[in-house]
Every structure is written in C-alpha cells, then in structure tokens.
Amino acid sequence: MRHAKKFDCGVSPECYASPHLWFNRKFSALFKSRLLRSTIAFSLISLSPAVFAQDAKAPADTTAEDNARVNAPLPPAEAAMKAHVMFLASNAMKGRDAGSPEYDIAAEYVASQYYAAGLRPAGDKGSYLQAVPLLSYRPADKGTLTVTRGGTPVTLEFGKDYIPGGDPEKLSTLIDAGVVFAGYGIVAPQYKRDDYKGVDVKGKIVAIFGGAPGTFDGEERAHFGSNANKAAIAASKGAAGVILIETPGSRRPFAQMVDFWNEWRMTWADAQGNGHLPAKGTPTLASLSTAGAAKLFGNDKGWAAATKAVADGKPVLKSFATRATLAAALKTERKMVMSSNVAGIIPGSDPALKDEVVVLTAHLDHVGVGRPDAKGDTIYNGAMDNAMGIASLIEEAKRFRDSGKAPRRSVMFLAVTAEEKGLIGADYFAHNPTVPKDKIVANVNLDMPVITYKFEDMIAFGAARSTLGDIVARATATVGVGVGTDPMPEQGFFVRSDHYRFVQQGVPSVFLWPGMAGVGREAFDRFLTTRYHRASDEITNPEILWDQGVRFIEANYVIAREIADADARPAWKKGDFFGTLYNGYGAK
C-alpha cells in the first residue's frame, strides 16, 4: 500500500510520471511524524524502507516463540489464508520488489493458486501471466537551463535554482521556447476555474505551481493537484513542456529534493519501448526553487502578484505570458525490466451478461530489501501490505468455486505488479486489458487490509460515487457489518490505490478496508506507527487475527457475488465528477 500523501507534489518531477513516488522516497522526518500523528500514513504510495530504520538496541532472540506462534494450528479457512501469507511474506521472497526474481516466483505461486481455485487463465497467450514492461528512468546528467530576458542569457544553477526532470519518452530533450505562467495549471469548470483563460500556450513552456487550492474538495483536490493531470492539461493546450515551481510555503520544499534528483523513477513502456506518460510530447523539464523562479520571472508584475496571492491564501491566480524564453537541454537514462500481472477468470453463466467482466484487484509487490532494523533485518516482507490482500483474493476465488454456482457475469481476479512504484501494473492493465475494455463494468480493490482487530464495519472508498455503494451496503449487512464513513475525507484516498487506474478508464470502482469503528482506529494507527513499510510487517506479528481475515474474505465475496449477479451493471451517479470526467457509464 502506498504511503499517505497529497497530490500537491510540490516541485518534484517524479510526481509527474507517478504521483506517488515523491512520498515513496523523499519523505522528511518532520513530515513523517506529522502524518503519522494524523494517521494519513496510507499507502496507496510507497515510502523508502530507509525512512523507518531503527537505532534501538538489539532485542532478545524470539525465533522459537515466533515459530511456535506462526505454526500453531488454525481452523481450515484461517489456515488456508495464512498459508498464502506464510509463503508470500517469507524471507525467501525478499519483499517481492517488482521486477525482481522473487516477485516472479510470487507471481508463479499466485498463478498456481488460481489454477487450484478453478480459475481460467486470463493473461497472455493462454497463460495466467500478463507481461508488464517496466521502464525505469532518471536524469542522465544535471542538464542545463538558460533563461533569456531582454536579450541577456542567464544560466540557472543546478541544486540552487533547479533540478532536472527525466523524460521517459526520449533520451535527449532540447527545447527553446517562451514561458507562460498558468497559476496552478488547473481547468475545473465545476469550480468555475480555468487557469489557461486569456493565455495562449501552444508551443510554449508552461510554468505552474504544485498542488491545488484548499477550497477544492478532498478527492477532487487530490485529482487537480496531481502533476500528471496538470501536465495532461498542458499537453491538451499544445504546450511544449512544463516547469514546476516551488509553491510559497510548500510542505515539500525544494531543498529537500535536491539530494534525490537522480533517483530512478518508473513507468511502463509502450510497444516502441518508450515510457508511458499521460501527457505525451509535453515533458516535465525541471523543478524550480523560489530563487530559480525569481530569475525566470524577473520583475514581471504578474509574478509578484501571484506569489502574494498564494502567500495570502487566495485560490485564484492571474495567468500571464512572461517576457522570458527558456532553453532546456536534458538527457535521460533508461533501463527496462519485465514483470507481470497475474490474471484468472471465472466465465459468466448468463448468456446476456457473461461478456461483462467484474475485475477484483490486489497488488502483489512490496518494497523489497532495505536498510537494516535493530535486529539487522533488511527484508521488508509486506505481510499485511499486501500479501494479505492477495491471500484474500485467492480465497475469494475459492468461495466462488465452492458455491457450486457460476456468477452471471464473468469475474476476473487480477494480482497487479508495481503498485509501490506508482500503480503501474494496474495502469498497464487498464490501458491494455486482456478482455475487451468496454466490457469491464466494475472494479473492487483490496490493499493492505489490517486484520489486527475485530472490525465492526467496512470502508468502501468511492462508494458514494456509483451504485456500487448500495451494493456494498446490502452485501456487508448480510455478514453482520455496516459501512463506515471515510475516516479522512480530506486526504482523497479514492484516488490513491490501484482501483483509480480503472476509474480513469471510466469504470465504477471501490476500494475496501476493514472499518475504523470501535477499536479499529487505534489498532490501525498502531500498525502504521510500528509495522507499516518496515521489516516488522511480518507474519510473526502477534496481533494478526486470522478469523478476522476470514470475515474480510467473506464480506468481499458477498460484495463481488452481488455485483456479478445483479440484473443491472454498476453505474456512476449522474453528474459525479470522476464519472463525468472519464465518460463513465451512467454519469452523463
């Protein structure tokens, strides 16, 4: 599961390629403590294991006690779930980093379990595996950025004025163009906002602030604050490139990112071997500090007005064409590694509905090997995140098999890769599905179900946006739990896990968690502060309640069964923002 973050990714070019990666690798200690205190530590975006390294004295060896607890007998349903986690979160899997040999072994394991559960292959060429070409990229050097105002060129200083962006589409990027300031780079008719109003950016470089104004709703603010979405808007306007500007008062200051300027980022590769980006042909060229922005804008009155407006908390900024040109010369280093999604399907039984597909997802990868903890443990096993979700997916498939009744619609079980790198496996499948795209009618996503307490309710992020909400409420009632409210709506969790890649294709989607009622919030917070994205997220965790895992599986099965057997396909609520934006069924 990805660590908590907002999509106002500051000035990081990484956020353009993958909105999750900034927090994954560059989370400051100050930020970490603040977010953990407010329990925003949700991984729909991954943190580097290094940020959680411990300096405590080595504890006593508890291996014998751990083995006794792990190997204690359980009822069959609990033991079946636990067995999957025992394998997937074992040290032999070395944290299941996407693209690693251990991830590939984990994928083969899931494929074998799909076969045992009676699922038909739904990957490539009659197999359970869908090949996913992962492309890592980073700036090959510091590049050069030169601002010219009034005929006088000024070369910006690396590390003080700018850090370069990588371009997964090209190895070499050369641009020399005028610059237009476009506020936050947002076009939002429902907020009566168009930051491109009155300016022509065709063939120009667009300079924008990161994030979105606080006047936007939580989930929609996360969407509009995404640098990937901003770049896509810039591309639609004909911009030649994007420059991200350090926002005054940013929680992600430029200085914190300089040490990480050349870390590897990741996307998926197209058939030509080039990296996929939402904004094709409009690369994010660089991120500018406040000092760099001052050199770019000089004494432009519009810039002075914009910085004052941001400092004063005013949401609307006036866009303007600057009197400057910017020449950028950048090089990108790339490397390819193959990974795979794992897809199995139960064919539908209703002649009129069997071609429609309900996709159930969970991510298989975790963060791999990292800095040692106090015990010297370097393997970040990812038991809860997300071996537990994969185990739930497999056991849910067995529920369908054991029911003796095929679903009316087809049901696909999809274990995706590289969630921790930016929802990449899910995005690849959503763009390149192994079933007809227009036949995918719903997605239900499982990511890091924390089963350390007896949950009294379930949270279905995104439920209110489509008829899936009514289905979830009816289904969970049959297993004795209610539907809780979003515990942190301002954080926009709806856009922060694999299901969002289906939303972006217009598919009604929900993301399920055990709820926070009763002792849930306290238990969830404890997991985040002691085990989340640490080497201690292991099956030896004495707080894991396997009977609650079975309850979670049963609730998910009932939800999926009702979606698959309903007379009507799921539909977006009429006028819903995401449904309308992505042309989803029922929204217009």
Question: Which role does the model predict for each range below?
Answer:
Residues 223-229, 250, 368, 374-467:
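Acidic/histidine-rich catalytic neighborhood of metal-dependent amide-processing enzymes
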Residues 94-213, 322, 334, 338-339:
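Noncatalytic luminal/extracellular "stalk/propeptide" segments of secretory-pathway proteins
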Residues 156, 269-304, 416-516, 520-528:
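Metal-dependent peptidase/peptidase-like ectodomains
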Residues 69, 148-150, 158-198, 275-382, ...:
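Soluble metallo-hydrolase cores and metallopeptidase-like ectodomains found primarily
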Residues 157-276, 347, 378-381, 385, ...:
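Extracellular/luminal Protease-associated
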Residues 54-123, 355, 573, 588:
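N-terminal hydrophobic or amphipathic helices/low-complexity stretches enriched
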Residues 398, 402, 513, 519-582:
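His/Asp/Glu-rich mid-to-C-terminal helical/loop segments that flank catalytic regions of hydrolases
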